[in-house]
């Protein structure tokens, strides 16, 4: 199963390279998204077949991956529906993180600090919203992604293991990718922003899907030692 994960991750990275090299062909973007969604589904089935005890985590992660895929399809067509679907995917990721550890004060403190930084950035003169509702969408989205990052970091701080490390890394890349998306859409002066956005977005989703496999292996090893 590790081989399957690595092959599919390599396929995503290769497709992502050509997606950016060929001037962001939409079909290649959707292909990348489809692959990480399929990888998540494979790991979900593997978790079920190996009778993992915390199936709610895997189902929530799969839901997050699916809505990320759907958001990829929608956001190039309509920004607000696409962002809404992405936000829903992030909510499922936060829920999944909560099935690893319950929400603690540290998670809220980290997430709150990140959100405050996002608010300051979104109201700075650098960022221009031609349509006012876009600012509201970005603020709501920032609250969700900040909560996601805060929970991931909090989980890792309390319990440093391969699963929480993988998820924390994925969440950070996700946050950075979203930041670059805002820079590309609402600042638009950095030519490298689209590449930075997609260059970190798909690796983030790869790690999200891969974290499901990492947790399966980790929990199975713990069960064998008992």
Question: Where are these predicted regions, by residue range?
Answer:
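Polytopic alpha-helical membrane-helix bundles and their juxtamembrane interface segments
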Residues: 1-226
